[in-house]
């Protein structure tokens, strides 16, 4: 694609000028252009983009164009080399290179004359970024942004690097342009050598189908994988290297603690969380977390804040609080949610990130100046000075400080110093937002809100998750198609696999809290999952249905507010859009996903798709989903290093074999739900008096037409519903009063006798009896529920469900 030249001032067309005028208020607000400029000197095609990062390059003299899906097969560059530059809005060095090089007319002349120049927002096109980042890591040992690549017209790498100053960058693009003109064969030869390094011929391997991983194999491998991650977390601190939170590792270890009771795993996570919360990487004043630290001791944050970081940390803190009951986890979680709601919420969802830079200086919003701290005008009691920075401002050295919490022993939000520090910070200029709404990131946050609700029972978290998912459904889905990005009210960019998967996962998670579907809905679902050839989803128009009909999911989900229906529609669309063999059986989907990213700051796409399919299968009993899930688990690499890189998937497989639940569960193949909640004991008793124990309420909801046997059964062949406490201390057997509801007496199709049943919604209460203050909460480990679900026609196998409070 040849862009209209922007090399000469004012050479752009009227269409670009019209778009500029429409977007001028936003550009002025972001200080990209002055309000008194009516016709800029340069406008390029990025003015049409739905990315704040790309828009910041839209008035540069370079003839930039956006990445397009068609570039995967053909750049249409004619005989020109292709220059691809990848970055993102909160990347400091991306903006430095933009000012030094891409705003420079001499460099623009070279690029415009000799290259097709493509600018990529890595958050819009994560797989494009992943491909070139992996190549840079292979060739140079490490990768960073901006990520700059020069390609042949066929798309083979000729040169790749990250930030270069203006002189070095000029030398590279000039040299390769001249060589391309004079010795194109030499360029092709160089590209072939690089291609051989980046994409070598695969080594012969055994066919995974002939040596699949069975459940028994997984059970043998899993303990080693958890131990490997545990050791990695302990050894993480290496001098001079950046440090990330490792939420994926910590969540997996907490789950394994729930399964095994291995205290070392819990201790490792608690130590890591304490270090984070007592460091400036946690913003204890506004709430929320910076992305990572540039040092190994959590002292110097990289100051940008990402929506996905907040989502991951909310989920981690919710689980830590659910397991330990320690209030500082809940406080940090609540603060982070409050920050996201205040800073990131917009009409279509939540903005993707907050920049590190304010007033032209990295981290300035978070710094405290020497004068207020030294003079005592700002009360910092309960906080500590962690790091000091020296800045050269107008030839004067100015001292700035970072502060963090000094203790986690009390609610820091109640400190006088906390209020004073908030007041001091409000005087500062806030860093800028990247307002684009990313479907997958927003879905992660919706899931995090549900995680927070499940351990706090705070209704606003559930309400916010519902509102967010509805906003995404309305804003990111147009004419039956999902899009990845919503920016300034406009949906764009084809969805990535992670968008389908995480949006579907969020919908299925929400379905737990929605009313059961009606019988009509169930019939629609049954028809949709009917099989035409043994393993195939019914297509929108296929040989197994009438030509005038459309897929039940495709039509109903577009208007249905049922989260489960919407989740299934998203999975159907994912399988269709990433299908290449026309069979809709998941084979080509699986082939694509095996080459996608490994765990990083976010869990891998492989894991996200697997988890979405697992939830979809639970709610729909789809044989297609079940078969594809089996392919994921059986065909995964046996190599320890591959399992380490996909630890989020390893954790998910472990959970499928032995669920690590907190206070809720789905049972009866999706036809029943349980949630348990603990209310504190009465602590108003006098000193040295015993207090009444807390009450655990276990709430069951059964789908219409399903039931479980009552606690007392008429015949021994029926399994009664029982609930009991499992305690840490075997010799501390405080009496527990368990109150079961009155059963309903009914006669069903499979029995001539009247049966005592529980159906619909019912509750079982466990009261701790007379115990010392707080004893129940300390010694309680879990609740064991024995249950058997039946419909009017059949009974499922009995289940034992363990919940942890």
Q: What are the residue ranges of the model-derived segments?
A:
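N-terminal pre-domain segments of enzymes
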Residues: 3-55
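Catalytic cores of eukaryotic secretory-pathway lumenal/extracellular enzymes that build
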Residues: 37-43, 61-63, 87-92, 103-104, ...
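Extracellular/lumen-exposed scaffold segments
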Residues: 640-805
């Amino acid at each position: 694609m040849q862009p209209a030249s922007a090399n000469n001032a004012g050479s752009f067309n009227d269409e670009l000028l019209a778009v500029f005028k429409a977007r001028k208020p936003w550009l002025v607000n972001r200080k990209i252009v002055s309000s008194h400029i009516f016709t800029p000197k340069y406008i390029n095609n990025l003015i049409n983009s739905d990315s704040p990062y790309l828009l910041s390059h839209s008035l540069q003299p370079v003839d930039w164009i956006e990445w397009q899906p068609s570039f995967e097969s053909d750049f249409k560059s004619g005989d020109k080399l292709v220059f691809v530059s990848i970055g993102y809005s909160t990347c400091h060095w991306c903006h430095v290179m933009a000012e030094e090089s891409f705003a420079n007319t001499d460099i623009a002349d070279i690029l415009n004359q000799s290259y097709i120049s493509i600018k990529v927002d890595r958050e819009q096109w994560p797989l494009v970024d992943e491909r070139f980042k992996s190549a840079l890591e292979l060739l140079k040992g490490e990768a960073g942004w901006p990520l700059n690549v020069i390609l042949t017209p066929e798309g083979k790498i000729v040169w790749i690097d990250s930030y270069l100053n203006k002189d070095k960058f000029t030398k590279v693009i000039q040299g390769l342009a001249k060589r391309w003109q004079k010795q194109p064969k030499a360029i092709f030869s160089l590209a072939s050598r690089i291609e051989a390094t980046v994409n070598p011929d695969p080594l012969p391997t055994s066919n995974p189908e002939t040596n699949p991983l069975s459940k028994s194999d997984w059970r043998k491998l899993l303990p080693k994988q958890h131990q490997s991650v545990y050791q990695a977390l302990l050894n993480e601190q290496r001098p001079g290297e950046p440090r990330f939170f490792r939420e994926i590792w910590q969540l997996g270890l907490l789950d394994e603690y729930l399964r095994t009771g291995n205290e070392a795993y819990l201790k490792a996570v608690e130590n890591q969380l304490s270090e984070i919360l007592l460091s400036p990487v946690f913003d204890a004043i506004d709430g929320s977390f910076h992305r990572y630290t540039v040092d190994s001791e959590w002292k110097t944050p990289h100051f940008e804040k990402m929506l996905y970081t907040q989502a991951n940390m909310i989920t981690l803190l919710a689980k830590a609080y659910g397991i330990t009951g320690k209030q500082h986890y809940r406080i940090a979680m609540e603060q982070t949610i409050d920050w996201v709601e205040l800073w990131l919420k917009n009409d279509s969802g939540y903005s993707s990130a907050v920049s590190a830079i304010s007033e032209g200086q990295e981290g300035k919003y978070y710094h405290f100046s020497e004068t207020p701290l030294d003079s005592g005008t700002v009360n910092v009691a309960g906080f500590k000075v962690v790091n000091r920075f020296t800045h050269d401002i107008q030839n004067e050295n100015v001292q700035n400080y970072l502060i963090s919490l000094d203790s986690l022993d009390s609610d820091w939000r109640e400190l006088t110093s906390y209020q004073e520090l908030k007041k001091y910070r409000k005087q500062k200029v806030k860093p800028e937002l990247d307002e684009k709404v990313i479907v997958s990131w927003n879905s992660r946050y919706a899931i995090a809100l549900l995680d927070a609700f499940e351990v706090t029972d705070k209704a606003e978290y559930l309400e916010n998750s519902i509102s967010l998912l509805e906003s995404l459904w309305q804003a990111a889905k147009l004419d039956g198609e999902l899009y990845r990005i919503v920016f300034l009210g406009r949906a764009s960019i084809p969805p990535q696999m992670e968008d389908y998967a995480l949006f579907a996962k969020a919908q299925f998670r929400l379905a737990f809290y929605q009313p059961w579907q009606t019988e009509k809905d169930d019939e629609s679902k049954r028809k949709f999952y009917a099989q035409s050839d043994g393993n195939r989803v019914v297509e929108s128009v296929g040989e197994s249905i009438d030509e005038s009909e459309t897929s039940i999911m495709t039509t109903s989900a577009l208007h249905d507010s049922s989260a489960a229906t919407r989740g299934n529609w998203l999975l159907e669309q994912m399988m269709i859009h990433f299908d290449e063999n026309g069979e809709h059986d998941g084979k080509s989907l699986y082939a694509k996903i095996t080459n996608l990213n490994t765990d990083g700051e976010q869990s891998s796409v492989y894991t996200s798709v697997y988890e979405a399919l697992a939830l979809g299968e639970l709610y729909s009993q789809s044989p297609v989903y079940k078969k594809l899930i089996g392919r994921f688990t059986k065909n995964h690499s046996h190599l320890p290093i591959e399992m380490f890189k996909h630890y989020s998937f390893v954790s998910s497989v472990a959970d499928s074999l032995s669920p690590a639940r907190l206070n809720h569960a789905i049972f009866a193949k999706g036809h029943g739900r349980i949630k348990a909640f603990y209310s504190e004991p009465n602590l108003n008793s006098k000193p040295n008096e015993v207090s009444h124990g807390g009450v655990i309420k276990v709430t069951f909801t059964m789908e219409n037409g399903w039931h479980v046997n009552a606690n007392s059964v008429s015949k021994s062949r029926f399994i009664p519903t029982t609930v009991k406490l499992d305690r840490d201390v075997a010799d501390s057997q405080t009496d527990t009063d368990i109150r079961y509801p009155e059963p309903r007496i009914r006669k069903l199709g499979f029995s001539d006798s009247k049966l005592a049943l529980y159906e619909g919604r019912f509750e079982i209460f466990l009261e701790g009896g007379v115990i010392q203050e707080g004893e129940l909460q300390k010694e309680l480990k879990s609740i064991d529920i024995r249950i058997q679900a039946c419909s009017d026609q059949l009974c499922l196998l009995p289940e034992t469900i363990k919940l942890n409070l």
